[in-house]
Design a protein with these regions (language model features):
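Conserved phosphate-binding elements of NTP-dependent enzyme cores
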Residues: 1-756
Length: 756
């Protein structure tokens, strides 16, 4: 056999040449394949631009191009990243923190295929015998509850919130968002020929009311066109009520909250299944009971089943359930709706899909996989990342936690700063070399926040009594006012249930979370924070013109792109294309608006500035006050005109905090504010939290980061475990007392962090 090396063996590195996506500064870097590579650097240094925006994006674009144009029309349109060359790419699988599904029919069980395996087990060995397996699916007509149609809940719709009985259809009697006069839905009702469009609804007969509200889907013909007519209530249920509430448009969500009352389905008691499916048992349990069990309990139940005829299936199901437990999700149940998962939980559920995969030589791309994980769970996550690597895969991880950086085979550090000051490779190599380097990450890798010895004295308390949301066990606890309180515990211990389920009801509480900021692609930090108002006023005064000229959403908008900066072209069966507007060249404004300047800059140039640059430009007034708040929360690198849709969860939370900081004497509730923060940024966050407390505010933080725990005045630790094993307060007191006296999981890891 020849000893000559195979030519294919030379392709063992991903080669990036001349990457310029976003703030990347002509980056050249080689990344070893079949290794675990961790990308570090400040928030905004260019990590995601390199990993997601360049490497993963190009891999997915090349794969998508192998499909027919018909198939591509149903896939997202991906442009080629701004890079000179990318070599030796393998197929990329992105495991990010985007929430899963906008549909109530998607659950943890359906997302991981555990529900499908469980259905087959029940169809094969259940008593009485019932086949096929679709009989046990709430998404199948054979298995769904006839009352709630497989949703597990019923709805009562207030008819008077749907229509105005004093008007006719032509006068706009239907008051549902999207059904106004002239809309497509309105035209279907008016031109169907089934209703008198000029007759007041108050004068409708019982038959006409039935046709308007309840008629099942019916084919109607208008001229030469045929279309489907459906009663208003079934149409609303189908188009609105099956969606995740958080994914609804603002007007639709407000309408649903106003017009619809939801309740657990009385017929299936929330199980979603019909009586036949609920009658079948395996080892004394129905499939509904199994789906409602905690995953760790279900894993133990499945392991005890002795059914040789379905042993391979039980092994596969057991492996999936054990994987969920290993990623710290043992407290979930298979019937938990996917849309209710946090970003970190959603990412770990996606990860489980790939752990049992037969694929090899794939590139897995992770975005902060430790988000939402207690230090106790991070070690288990690290083992899973290493197991993916050991199957011959390339694992690329964007991460800030030292525990995960420590297991890397290869580290790529970007910086030296954020935004325009970032985008350069400051270090590549192993972890030991990073620790010895003089980069910001290297200097902070072993940095430890000192334990707060002298805690601040509270000015009062907010009492929570009898809290029993989700897994809480009738918890009574006092939240001290005027200090920094950190609520800790493993994932699923009840932290969010305690804080979010009890505190928002109190007056003066400001909840600053990581949920998506609602708005269009035109929304940006300048519009969201109100910064654009003083900027427009300054331009108007300097040029003696109307302030409305300097809005890309009204008078000042480019007529070609309507102020969007891009023109969207529909290519029928092929994917639509967004191209930079030729008239305004992406600047969004009319030429005559851009002719007006403020200290030598036009409005588009100001909106292109980062927060840091804008602080130097606006040295006083309301604009400077808002910019200072954005800088204080660590968003100095953000561009004023950057679309809000591009922000991460951590960035969204800090943007909301910047808006809320103007309030005095408030109680701020923050959910994992260290998400997305570099080790150096954590120090800045702690200084900000201290300033809020010193200004008379109260800060309550749900957090896993040991640096925040050590810096707290008061700690409330929940546990001792997750799910049924959690829901109790296992410690209350100062960080020093936690380290000295407690034996909780949090105490052990905080002691290890402090080297005690």
């Amino acid at each position: 056999m020849s000893s000559e090396p195979f030519t294919a063996d030379a392709h063992d590195t991903i080669q990036v040449r001349g990457a310029r996506e976003n703030n990347l500064a002509d980056v050249d870097v080689d990344i070893p394949k079949r290794r675990l590579s961790v990308f570090t650097g400040l928030s905004g240094s260019g990590k995601s631009s390199l990993v997601f925006g360049t490497i993963a994006a190009e891999s997915q674009r090349l794969i998508n191009e192998t499909y027919t144009t018909f198939v591509q029309s149903f896939m997202p349109s991906l442009g080629r990243p701004d890079v000179d060359a990318l070599r030796n790419l393998s197929a990329a699988i992105i495991v990010d923190q985007e929430r899963m599904g906008a549909n109530s029919r998607s659950t943890v069980g359906t997302a991981t295929d555990a529900a499908a395996m469980l259905r087959i087990v029940f169809s094969r060995v259940g008593t009485p015998r019932l086949e096929p397996s679709s009989v046990f699916s709430f998404n199948s007509s054979e298995g769904m509850c006839p009352e709630c149609e497989g949703l597990g809940r019923t709805d009562q719709i207030d008819i008077d919130e749907l229509v105005d009985r004093d008007l006719s259809l032509n006068e706009g009697a239907i008051t549902v968002p999207g059904y106004g006069v002239g809309t497509w839905y309105w035209q279907v009702f008016v031109h169907s020929g089934l209703l008198d469009a000029d007759k007041r609804l108050a004068d409708y007969t019982e038959r006409e009311w039935h046709t308007l509200l309840h008629l099942p889907t019916t084919k109607v013909k208008v001229g030469t066109n045929s279309f489907s007519y459906e009663g208003l209530i079934p149409k609303i249920r189908r188009t609105y009520l099956t969606k995740d509430r958080e994914k609804m448009q603002t007007a639709v969500r407000a309408f649903v909250d106003r017009a619809v009352v939801f309740a657990v389905c009385p017929q299936c008691e929330g199980s979603r299944l019909n009586a036949r499916a609920r009658s079948v048992k395996v080892a004394g349990r129905t499939i509904a009971e199994c789906s409602a069990m905690q995953v760790d309990e279900l894993a133990a139940f499945v392991a005890c089943l002795d059914e040789p005829s379905v042993k391979p299936l039980l092994d596969g199901l057991g492996h999936t359930l054990d994987s969920l437990v290993r990623v710290g999700l043992g407290y979930l149940s298979l019937d938990r709706e996917s849309g209710t998962l946090s970003g970190g939980e959603a990412q770990r559920v996606k990860m489980v899909r790939h752990l049992g995969s037969s694929l090899s030589d794939v590139t897995y791309v992770f975005d902060e996989p430790t988000v939402g994980l207690h230090p106790h769970d991070i070690e288990r996550m690290n083992h899973l990342l290493l197991s993916l690597r050991d199957k011959g895969n390339t694992v690329l991880v964007v991460e800030h936690k030292p525990e995960t950086i420590a297991i890397a085979d290869h580290v790529v550090d970007l910086g030296p700063g954020a935004g325009p000051a970032g985008g350069h490779i400051t270090y590549t190599g192993d972890v030991a070399g990073l620790r010895a380097s003089d980069t910001l990450t290297g200097r902070h890798l072993d940095h430890r926040v000192a334990l707060r010895e002298q805690v601040r004295r509270p000015t009062g308390v907010l009492s929570i009594t009898g809290a029993d949301t989700h897994n809480l066990k009738n918890v009574d606890v006092d939240i001290p006012l005027g200090v920094l309180t950190v609520v800790t515990g493993v994932a699923g211990s009840g932290k969010s249930s305690l804080v979010h389920g009890s505190l928002p009801a109190h007056e003066g509480v400001v909840v600053v979370d990581q949920s998506p900021i609602r708005g269009s692609r035109r929304s940006n930090p300048a519009t969201y924070t109100g910064l654009l108002d003083p900027i427009r006023t300054a331009f108007a005064r300097a040029n003696k013109v109307k302030a409305s000229l300097f809005s890309a959403n009204s008078e000042g908008a480019c007529p070609q792109c309507k102020g969007a900066g891009v023109v969207y072209t529909d290519l029928a069966m092929m994917a639509g294309v967004a191209s930079t507007c030729e008239q305004c060249r992406g600047r969004r404004f009319r030429p005559e608006v851009l002719a007006h300047t403020l200290r030598g800059k036009d409005i588009s140039q100001v909106l292109a500035m980062s927060v840091v640059q804008a602080r130097e430009f606006f040295t006083s007034g309301n604009a400077r006050t808002i910019l200072d708040r954005l800088h204080d929360v660590g968003l100095g690198y953000l561009s004023l005109g950057q679309p809000l849709t591009t922000l991460s969860g951590g960035e969204r939370q800090r943007l909301k905090l910047a808006i809320s900081m103007a309030r005095q004497g408030a109680v701020y509730v923050l959910d994992e504010p260290t998400t997305g923060l570099h080790l150096a940024d954590v120090d800045r966050l702690l200084a900000l939290l201290d300033r809020l407390v010193q200004g008379g505010d109260t800060v309550v933080v749900i957090e896993h980061h040991q640096a925040v725990m050590a810096h707290a005045d008061h700690i409330i630790d929940l546990g001792p475990g997750a799910g049924h094993d959690g829901g109790r307060v296992v410690f209350e007191g100062s960080p020093a007392a936690l380290v000295a006296d407690a034996d909780t999981l949090t105490a052990r890891h905080l002691r290890a962090y402090l080297g005690r």
